[in-house]
Amino acid sequence: MIGRHYLRPEKVIEELQNINPEALLADGCEDAIIGIAEVWRDGGRHHVVAYSVQGVIEQFMRDNDWDYETADEYFSVNTVGAYVGVNTPIYIDEMRDIHASYRGMEVLPEDMYEF
């Protein structure tokens, strides 16, 4: 398995602000930032922040004491489903297990995806 080595979120945000000061961030999801993406929207190239789907869901579970299903539903409706213009972040599915627990129970891959 290839290791994942990402810059610290504050470094990514600093660089993104230099490239695109209009880029939007998802509140409270800084730990899920994995980089900067270049996207084509509305006839132009834009640099936006890229988040890990699993990282955002894990963050929602920790911050709100939610189970996986609640965090995933909130993410689907209120986060990934919210397009607010060309500077909207993107969310990348890293195809990895969520290593979070809820009340002592490990969240398993089969709880995340249909195989």
Can you name each region flagged by the protein language model?
Residues I2-F115:
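C-terminal alpha-helical interaction appendages
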